[in-house]
Amino acid sequence: TLGLVAPVTTVSADTANSENIAVKTNNESTQSTDTSGLEIYDQYVQVNPEKNQFELSKLGEKVLPTTVSSQIQSQLNATNKEIKANNFIIDPETKAIVKYSPYINFAASVSGAARLRSGCYVRWFWWGFRFYFTSNAAVTWFRGILGGASSGATIGNLVAAATGHAMAATTIEAFGMYADSMSRDLYDYNKKHRRSKVYMDLNGVFQYSFHTF
């Protein structure tokens, strides 16, 4: 499971159009567009289809600082161990981790993703989760969960049932602290992109970002 450091929240729009949004860490507020989670290093991670395992690429070993490559390798080792123990499959095209063959595991509008409900899908990656929203109704539904008293537990149960992978306890706990902010940010981003479908990335340190697809 993911749970690298104490939860923080960093929010940004798609990389081509980043926005400054308040970041709260230990009751302090700053301004930042940095996303220091491991997902920014995904380009240096490759899939070994024969072993059904993730590997740090030779380029990553060469160009990344030792502290970064060590952290990535540690996360890959943990993820690979879970994949092997539970017979998960890595989709070599998307790097998503699935319970069934990516060639038979599909969902409307988001091929290969697991369905949470109509219009809302999720993919599990080595660095965290990606939530897809293909309708305004799905956004409203997800925000409704975020507004509940047990938002983290509810989302954690839905994700675990859909992907077979349990969210880290720190992530579930962080939902309780940042659910209102996430709900508001999701609403605002979706409102700005009414003509597009949106998705939200959530990494292991509870940094989340919104994008269109």
Tell where the protein language model's regions lie, with residue ranges.
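N-terminal propeptides/leader regions of secreted preproproteins
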Residues: 8-120
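Short hydrophobic membrane-inserting alpha-helices and related fusion/pore-forming segments
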Residues: 150-173
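Bacterial N-terminal signal peptides
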Residues: 1-5
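Short loop/turn hinge sites at secondary-structure boundaries
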Residues: 79, 86, 164, 189-195
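Intrinsic-disorder-associated interaction segments
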Residues: 33-34, 61, 65, 69-72, ...
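Glycine-centered structural positions embedded in regular secondary structure
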Residues: 6-7, 12, 200-204
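Canonical hydrophobic alpha-helical transmembrane segment
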Residues: 9-14, 169-181
